[in-house]
């Protein structure tokens, strides 16, 4: 019997520009279609770290040329990234499904996610966005643009922005209705458009990027998923990452994960939210499993052949 699976796809896996994204979504679609073909019900959330940074930079450059132009709010940059990533991914996935004789629909839902305007994360930016830079380049941007910068898992330096905790998925009813009628749903792109609920049901955009792994976990809980698959740049989670005593982990209990988190084993804004999301999902209901692995290893991971599985 097929499982209900939520896939959390990293924004870095979608390429650094539009041509790269077109190629990336084709490969991504093959892996997703494998799961659909195997009889699973699938919903896909995706990151937007590189893409939302590029959108923000493009509008900032335009504002320098046109001083009367408005600065584009970060929440709108997230909305734009949902649109163009969803457009490419939806079309590539539908094409792949049809080529396999599969008739499932594919729908992208522009998704807002409620956050708390008083979340401490607004005072402590940790979420990497934009492209990787050298330390010298990052320090220059910090001086010239006032960016907060941080090293991202030893891969380079990036701008970091606020990443508040996701509280509620505004379009949940619509997403659930689509998922329950044989559609592959693309939702919570970039972690969702961050909004703050105000009086009279008004939703106000927030200057933040929600972590897509935590948003995916929230979506997975409310869609009553059996499995949350968090895709990343490595096949398994490791402790002592990039050190001589590095150790790959086949399985983790929530208790073991918390011990490693307490030791500072996982980088904030990178592997840490993935492990935190996996633990939260595994503990949310008996029988639920989270898997952290590479995109191309997702099907093997479901079968228990690879990846890091987090279960109670």
Where are these regions (language model features)?
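C-terminal catalytic "cap/lid" subdomain
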Residues: 2-312
């Amino acid at each position: 019997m097929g499982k209900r699976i939520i896939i959390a796809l990293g924004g870095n896996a979608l390429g650094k520009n539009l041509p790269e994204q077109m190629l990336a979504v084709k490969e991504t679609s093959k892996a997703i279609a494998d799961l659909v073909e195997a009889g699973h019900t699938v919903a896909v959330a995706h990151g937007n770290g590189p893409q939302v940074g590029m959108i923000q930079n493009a509008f900032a450059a335009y504002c320098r040329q046109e001083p009367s132009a408005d600065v584009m709010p970060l929440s709108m940059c997230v909305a734009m990234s949902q649109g163009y990533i969803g457009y490419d991914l939806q079309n590539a996935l539908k094409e792949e499904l049809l080529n396999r004789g599969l008739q499932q629909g594919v729908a992208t839902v522009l998704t807002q996610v409620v956050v708390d305007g008083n979340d401490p994360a607004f005072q402590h930016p940790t979420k990497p966005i934009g492209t990787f830079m050298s330390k010298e380049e990052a320090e220059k941007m910090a001086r010239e643009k006032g960016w907060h910068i941080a090293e991202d898992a030893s891969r380079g330096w990036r701008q970091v922005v606020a990443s508040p905790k996701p509280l509620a998925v505004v379009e949940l009813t619509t997403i659930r209705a689509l998922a329950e009628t044989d559609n592959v749903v693309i939702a919570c792109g970039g972690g969702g458009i961050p909004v703050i609920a105000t009086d009279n049901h008004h939703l106000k955009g927030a200057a933040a990027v929600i972590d897509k792994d935590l948003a995916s976990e929230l979506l997975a809980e409310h869609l009553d998923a059996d499995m949350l698959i968090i895709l990343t740049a490595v096949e398994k989670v490791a402790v002592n990452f990039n050190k001589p005593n590095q150790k790959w982990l086949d399985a983790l209990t929530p208790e073991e994960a918390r011990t490693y988190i307490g030791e500072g084993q996982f980088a904030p804004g990178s592997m840490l939210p993935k492990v935190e999301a996996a633990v939260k999902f595994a503990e949310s209901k008996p029988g639920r499993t989270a898997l952290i692995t590479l995109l191309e290893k997702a099907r093997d991971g479901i079968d228990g052949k690879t990846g890091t599985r987090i279960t109670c």
